[in-house]
């Protein structure tokens, strides 16, 4: 039995959830999201809770059960609180700035990297070396953070580059004479 899958998803006040076949739709103060569940999983709304259950007992059913419940829980959390990822930029002359619908990154290349901010995502730069990505869709927020980090990932010798806030970078020792 899945420890995560058997837990019901609480639907707080101000949030409405509806089922349309295999699609779960959630509306809240921050917006609306939906997810389509796989055929192996069934969902039902009981009062102010949404329960996810399996349609069988195979290994695939069990694997999809916990994941589906977490996807639904992320929808509810997204429309109530939202999600946020912070990136830190380390390096001499490395900086970021938001210009209209673009994020302008100076990462030591001969040119600035210009990243178009997708719909549903907000990016702010409280400091030139800090980027805060927020939105209601957890997958999209993580994907945008990963794409920005990929432009210049942290290198192991000096630690220069773009990294997640709180991420540990394994440091290497340089050559010895």
UniProtKB/Swiss-Prot annotation:
Role, per record: This protein binds to the 23S rRNA, and is important in its secondary structure. It is located near the subunit interface in the base of the L7/L12 stalk, and near the tRNA binding site of the peptidyltransferase center.
Q: Where are the transmembrane segments?
A: none
Q: Its GO CC terms? A: cytosolic large ribosomal subunit
* Quaternary structure note: Part of the 50S ribosomal subunit.
Give the classification, highest ranks.
Answer: Bacteria, Pseudomonadati, Pseudomonadota, Alphaproteobacteria, Hyphomicrobiales
Family per record: Belongs to the universal ribosomal protein uL6 family.
PROSITE patterns assigned to the protein according to its UniProt record, in alphabetical order: RIBOSOMAL_L6_1
GO terms assigned for molecular function = rRNA binding; structural constituent of ribosome
Q: Which GO terms describe its biological process?
A: cytoplasmic translation
Record's protein name = Large ribosomal subunit protein uL6
């Amino acid at each position: 039995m899945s420890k995560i899958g058997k837990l019901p998803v609480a639907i707080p006040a101000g949030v409405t959830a509806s089922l349309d076949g295999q699609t779960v739709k959630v509306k809240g103060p921050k917006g609306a999201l939906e997810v389509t569940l796989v055929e192996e999983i069934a969902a039902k709304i009981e009062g102010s809770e949404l329960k996810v259950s399996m349609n069988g007992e195979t290994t695939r059913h069990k694997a999809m059960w916990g994941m589906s419940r977490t996807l639904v829980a992320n929808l509810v959390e997204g429309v109530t609180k939202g999600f946020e990822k912070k990136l830190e930029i380390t390096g001499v002359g490395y900086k970021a700035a938001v210009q209209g619908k673009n994020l302008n990154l100076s990462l030591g290349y001969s040119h600035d990297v210009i990243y178009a901010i997708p719909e549903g995502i907000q990016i702010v730069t409280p400091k030139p070396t800090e980027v805060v990505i927020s939105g209601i869709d957890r997958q999209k927020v993580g994907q945008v953070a990963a794409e920005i980090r990929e432009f210049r990932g942290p290198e192991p010798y000096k630690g220069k580059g773009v990294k997640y806030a709180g991420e540990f970078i394994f440091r290497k020792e340089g050559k010895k004479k």
